[in-house]
A protein has these predicted regions:
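Low-complexity, intrinsically disordered short peptide segments enriched in small/polar/basic residues
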Residues: 8-12, 23-26, 49, 62
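Glycine-rich flavin
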Residues: 34-173
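A non-catalytic, amphipathic alpha-helix used as a structural packing/dimerization or gating element
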Residues: 18-32
């Protein structure tokens, strides 16, 4: 009975086998942030600044930023491996994923000047670009039903219409 109860509380996570060196490097960072760290952060309702900084210093949050902008230039699967390893270790990938992915908008839609100005700072952790507002009063976080729209007016202006309920990580973004 006791053995089956222990097994019921054990979580087995099977990770892919790609990017083994990356997995090991991420795991080494995660090992410095044991369960006690996360319990204290949770109890105090604090953002894990130290963890995010450690990921930044090791280049993981700039993984998808091209090398020409001081990032690692890794493929999307490598970023998934980073988050997969963070979460499997018991750390909180939610504190890191936005910094890794939001800059994709800048890569796709930013002009050359904006990329040169912002991407190196994001890659080095000098600029935090991780706030986002998805949740709306009538659609929740179902991004396929969002009603907020941005309409271009002229060459350099947009008019945004709609409502957002929360902006995640606004306090930890520049």
């Amino acid at each position: 009975m006791e053995g089956s109860r222990a097994a019921a509380h054990s979580v087995q996570v099977e990770l892919g086998s790609d990017f083994p060196e990356l997995r090991d490097a991420v795991q080494r960072v995660c090992d410095d942030f044991p369960g006690e760290y996360w319990r204290k952060k949770d109890e105090a309702q604090e953002y894990p600044k130290e963890f995010v900084q450690a990921l930044t210093e090791n280049g993981f949050l700039g993984a998808l930023i091209p090398e020409e902008y001081d990032g690692s230039g890794l493929p999307l699967r490598a970023a998934a491996v980073i988050l997969e390893t963070i979460n499997a270790s018991g750390c909180n990938g939610g504190a890191a994923h936005a910094q890794m992915y939001i800059m994709g908008t800048l890569l796709r839609h930013g002009n050359a000047e904006q990329k040169r100005k912002y991407l190196p700072g994001i890659a080095r952790g000098e600029l935090r670009l991780q706030a986002f507002g998805v949740t709306e009063p009538t659609t929740g976080s179902d991004t396929t039903k969002l009603k907020t729209r941005a309409e271009k007016k002229g060459n350099d202006r947009y008019v945004v219409t709609g409502q957002k309920v929360w902006t995640s990580r606004a306090l930890y973004s520049d």
